[in-house]
Amino acid sequence: MGRSLKKGPFVDEHLMKKVEAQVNAERKSVIKTWSRRSTIFPNFVGLTIAVYDGRKHVPVYVQEDMVGHKLGEFAPTRTYRGHAADDKKTRR
């Protein structure tokens, strides 16, 4: 179930302040954030945002097709190492 249209998209205020400061600055640097729940706005395009995945900050370069999605969608929290190998060969 999506968010109600009358509420509008959500962005943490502290993240929005950092993005606005970055857009106005000449030099672009990585913005660190723990806000995985924030929606990507059009003014985020071209910025690199380091999103926390529970262990480290994953750098996410924001492109136009990411607008409207959440930041957490681009920083996976679980590492898949594959299923255990079949031990039938070693048992012989």
From Swiss-Prot:
Pfam families: Ribosomal_S19. InterPro entries: Ribosomal_uS19 (IPR002222), Ribosomal_uS19_bac-type (IPR005732), Ribosomal_uS19_CS (IPR020934), Ribosomal_uS19_SF (IPR023575). GO terms for biological process: ribosomal small subunit assembly; translation. Disulfide bonds: none annotated. GO terms for molecular function: rRNA binding; structural constituent of ribosome. Gene3D superfamilies: 30s Ribosomal Protein S19, Chain A. GO terms for cellular component: cytoplasm; small ribosomal subunit. It comes from the Bacteria. Keywords: Ribonucleoprotein, Ribosomal protein, RNA-binding, rRNA-binding. Belongs to the universal ribosomal protein uS19 family. Protein S19 forms a complex with S13 that binds strongly to the 16S ribosomal RNA. This is Small ribosomal subunit protein uS19. It comes from Lactococcus lactis subsp. lactis (strain IL1403).
